[in-house]
C-alpha cells in the first residue's frame, strides 16, 4: 500500500495541488475486503502525511453487514474513535466516509461526513443479463 501511495505522490504533477486521499480501514477484519487494519492505521497515516503529492483527508470504511442497529453501530463507533484519535496528530483530516443506504442513519449519528447512498437514491441494482452493456 505504501508503494502505491509513493507512486501516486511521485507522479502528481508539481503544478497541481496534492491529491486528496482517504485511508481505507478494514474495520471488521473481513478477509474479503481490502484496507489497513485498525492497529496499523496510525503508522500508515504518519507515512502518508510525509508524501508531498498527497493530502490525507481522512478515513473510509465499509463495515460488515449487520441485521440490527446496535451491531451496525459498533464498527462505526470504532471508526469515529480512530478518526478522532488520528485528528490530534493530523488536524487536516476532515473526512470520515462510512455508511451506505442500509446503515446511513447509524453512520451519520456516529460522525460520518460522507455516506454512499446509491440504493436509497437510485433503487436496487439490476444484475440481470438484460442490463448488460
Indicate residue ranges for each PLM-predicted region.
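Conserved alpha/beta-domain cores
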Residues: 1-102, 108-110, 122-124
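C-terminal helical cap(s) of enzyme catalytic domains, especially alpha/beta-barrels
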Residues: 105-133
Amino acid at each position: 500500500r505504501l508503494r502505491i501511495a509513493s507512486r501516486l505522490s511521485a507522479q502528481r504533477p508539481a503544478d497541481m495541488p496534492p491529491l486528496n486521499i482517504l485511508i481505507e480501514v478494514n474495520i471488521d477484519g473481513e478477509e474479503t475486503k481490502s484496507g489497513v487494519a485498525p492497529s496499523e492505521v496510525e503508522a500508515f497515516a504518519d507515512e502518508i502525511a510525509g508524501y508531498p503529492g498527497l493530502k490525507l483527508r481522512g478515513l473510509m470504511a465499509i463495515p460488515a453487514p449487520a441485521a440490527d442497529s446496535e451491531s451496525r453501530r459498533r464498527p462505526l463507533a470504532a471508526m469515529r474513535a480512530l478518526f478522532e484519535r488520528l485528528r490530534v496528530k493530523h488536524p487536516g483530516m476532515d473526512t470520515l466516509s462510512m455508511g451506505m443506504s442500509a446503515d446511513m442513519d447509524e453512520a451519520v449519528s456516529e460522525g460520518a461526513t460522507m455516506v454512499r447512498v446509491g440504493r436509497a437514491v437510485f433503487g436496487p441494482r439490476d444484475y440481470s443479463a438484460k442490463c448488460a452493456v
